[in-house]
């Protein structure tokens, strides 16, 4: 059984699901799905924030920033990123739509907490970036750090297009690599201080991907869920590892698996094992 470190601060009591009179569907296409609104004339005189509905909760944002404080400049970049994600979510599945009311705590704060585990890291690689968690969030936070860089590795063309737009509008120090993870790792020659992945693959597979980077000095931080203990047990069949497991500052069953050293135990490697060979 691996020891779990519990964070010092408790999750803010204000963290809760956004509720109220908004419709269940976060993207209503007809005015009559809005409670009490029968036609467009009823929108006259309403405030701009009401006309521009966002499924994300202001209360949830406040709770997230209480957990993982950032500068006003970083907050502005994150706001732009969140707005873009909400727009793209209607046509590209970037996150589970059910998590949008808790996007700031569930995704933003969950990503930002990695910075505290690698405070000296400037050069990051995020494998399987998808909707940009944690990669784009980290890039937004590192934008004012001289020499900072985040490589966003994603093989899905639509998601890579979203990532490029997110990097552009936030002016963050990140670059998008449209390729398989294995190809990126094999071709990577630049320095990597920390490599990350979130909701991507089982640990034994992730370790196979990042082994070359970790053996060059990178730290690996993987955002995992309730199955982390079972994944660690399976990973020890292929790897000699001494992981440090941290509880997520956002509460719940989230965990962060940290690795500074990876030693291969099975010559086949975990990549092949995952494919069933």
Curated annotation (Swiss-Prot):
One of its GO terms (cellular component) is cytosol. It catalyses: guanosine(527) in 16S rRNA + S-adenosyl-L-methionine = N(7)-methylguanosine(527) in 16S rRNA + S-adenosyl-L-homocysteine. Its main location: cytoplasm. S-adenosyl-L-methionine binds at residues 128, 133, 188-189, 198. Keywords: Cytoplasm, Methyltransferase, rRNA processing, S-adenosyl-L-methionine, Transferase. It is found in: Cytoplasm. This is Ribosomal RNA small subunit methyltransferase G. It comes from Nitrobacter winogradskyi (strain ATCC 25391 / DSM 10237 / CIP 104748 / NCIMB 11846 / Nb-255).
